[in-house]
């Protein structure tokens, strides 16, 4: 079972590239971030044409997440991250697909830091940790994917110096991410690539893609029940180099079939 995550940086702008990727790679589940459209503008019919059913949590012009499943209906479990009823940003959705709880998130960027945007990021991560602890207690196969906007370690960026003042790798961001892992989650890509050097994002500026100046901020976290089924994980890097590409590449994890 392949579960993929792709920050598409706008459904409207990227739909041909997205359809292309889905048809070529055919993940069982595809989680999208930054769909950047209102609920009534999400192109669900286009995905149905190629066999994918979808649920989504949209927001006009910003944020937005969706879960697509190949040939089956994803069963929505949670919409919006619990813990703050005043938070109206569309960044979080959960669904059950083929016996796996799939969590899709778009974590706040936090720049500029310090400031209220960074404070919101850290508070959001604490709420996320609380929700993920609840999911761990359920002891079900759970996969948490998305754009976390956190560079976990120095090995996960092309240049520590270039990123040292960015919210993506501040000590508070890294500590919050580490606390989540320490609760019992497995970072699939890091587990299979312990030496680092795996990028999932390349900026549009300064020739970052051409110079391979990237970093890893799109993550795939597995509960113990899912980690036992880990077969492979990787990045579909080639899609970042295609015409009108997102600044992220798709990431994916392969789970063995449940016995």
Mark where each language-model region is.
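Surface-exposed cleft-lining segments at the edges of enzyme active sites
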Residues: 82-83, 108-125, 162-165
């Amino acid at each position: 079972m392949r579960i993929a995550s792709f920050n598409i940086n706008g459904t409207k702008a990227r739909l041909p590239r997205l359809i292309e990727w889905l048809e070529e790679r055919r993940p069982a589940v595809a989680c999208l971030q930054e769909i950047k459209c209102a609920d009534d503008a999400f192109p669900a019919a286009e995905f149905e044409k190629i066999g994918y059913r979808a649920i989504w949590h949209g927001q006009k012009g910003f944020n937005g997440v969706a879960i697509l499943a190949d040939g089956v209906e994803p069963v929505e479990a949670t919409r919006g991250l619990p813990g703050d009823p005043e938070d109206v940003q569309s960044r979080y959705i959960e669904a059950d697909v083929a016996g796996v709880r799939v969590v899709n998130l778009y974590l706040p960027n936090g720049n500029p830091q310090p400031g209220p945007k960074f404070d919101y990021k850290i508070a959001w991560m604490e709420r996320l940790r609380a929700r993920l602890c609840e999911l761990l207690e359920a002891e079900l196969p759970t996969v948490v994917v998305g754009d976390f906007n956190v560079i976990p370690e120095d090995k996960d960026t092309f240049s520590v110096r270039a990123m040292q003042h960015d919210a993506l790798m501040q000590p508070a961001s890294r500590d919050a991410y580490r606390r989540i892992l320490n609760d019992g989650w497995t970072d699939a890509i890091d587990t299979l690539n312990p030496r680092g050097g795996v990028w999932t994002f390349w900026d549009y500026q300064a020739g970052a893609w051409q110079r391979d100046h990237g970093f890893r901020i799109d993550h795939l976290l597995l509960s113990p029940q899912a980690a036992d089924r880990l077969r492979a994980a990787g990045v579909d890097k080639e899609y970042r180099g295609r015409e009108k590409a997102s600044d992220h590449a798709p990431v994916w994890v392969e789970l063995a079939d449940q016995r």
